[in-house]
Amino acid sequence: MPLVLNPNNRNRVVDRTDTLIQIPNNVGITNALGLFSPEYSTQKTIEVTRTKRSSHLVVDRNWDERNSTIAGRERDSLLLKIPHFHLDDAITPNDIDGVVQADSLTDAMELETVASVRADKMMDLRESHGITLEAARMQLITTGTVYAPTGTLRQGASATTNFYTEFGVTQTVVPVDLSSAADPRGDFRDIKAAIRAGLTPYGQGAVTGFVALVGSDYFAALMQNAFVTDAVKYTQGPLNAPVLTGVPGSYAGLDARFETITMWGITFIDASAAGYEDASGTFIPFVADDEAYFLPLGVRDMFKTYYAPANRFGTINRRAQGSYWFEYANEKDDIIEIMTEQNFLNACLYPAAVVKSELSI
């Protein structure tokens, strides 16, 4: 550690450690699971077209009867406006004038530079956009609605776009009893059946698995359920140790904060660590403690993130980027303006295949 002057006694020196950086407790999960597919648009509004095909069993007819006919395909579309999320900052002479770099390891002589201040601001801005995208995706999964808190997508009585409403379906909610004497297998079988039924009209390939994003109380009740414990006592396999010791494993691609256990063909992920800090510093989990959200894996294009280009001459009518950074120094040389934006819409094209479960004890 370097020696620096003691700020309380300039006649003495102290050892300076590396800088301890306190960051907001913002944790995401959707990227690691690979749930969303990006689509880069050239416009600020997209049209999701839907075609309903008609195919059914053909019945026999008498030879002199009129032949059977097949109904034509039904077509409709859904217009969706992509919200605009901008966040600005600036660098001024006061940010570097006589300011010592916070992570300087020399004798307080390294001063801030435009480059170092820019790097710090870039990191903070990117993290703000990143957790906003994650919160928007989790809002879609849990409520079926598009994140637009200021009402830019308001339509009549609807504060924002709701994919359950747009597709004319109702969110399936399955209470699950995880009390000590309950056998939850039937409830989870019903959940998987509801997911398959939600996918049936679309035929988007085979389901490769099921995953549940679970709140802390729900996950704890599952681990402590007596039926679950008894079921694994008399079998030999990788599931025994996590259940009997109460130490769940991890899921490929997720860090150790997300404990998991796989039973009955469902991977349960304790998603209580995923969330964000609000303005007051309170941690807000994406999944409520007593809730769980069940999703199919391997379904093509179930979740989408549509990006729109920035509203500038150099970007309009061109393929969008995931995010934008614009920087301008004024002629008076006393400020550098930083303008960043993300323009995205998260969409669930098969909302009936997302099943909500509530803990019932």
Tell what function each PLM region has.
Residues 35-103, 156, 160:
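Assembly/oligomerization interface modules of large self-assembling protein complexes
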Residues 32, 193-198, 322-324:
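Short alpha-helical segments and helix-capping/turn motifs at coil-helix boundaries
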Residues 225-361:
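Sequence/fold signature of self-assembling virion shell proteins
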Residues 173-175:
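Charged, low-complexity intrinsically disordered segments
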Residues 1-46, 344-361:
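N-terminal alpha-helical "arm" segments
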Residues 84-169, 183, 187-220, 334-342:
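Long, contiguous amphipathic alpha-helices that act as assembly "spine/axial" helices in icosahedral shell
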Residues 1-16, 191-192, 196-201, 208-248:
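Charge-rich, low-complexity N-terminal segments
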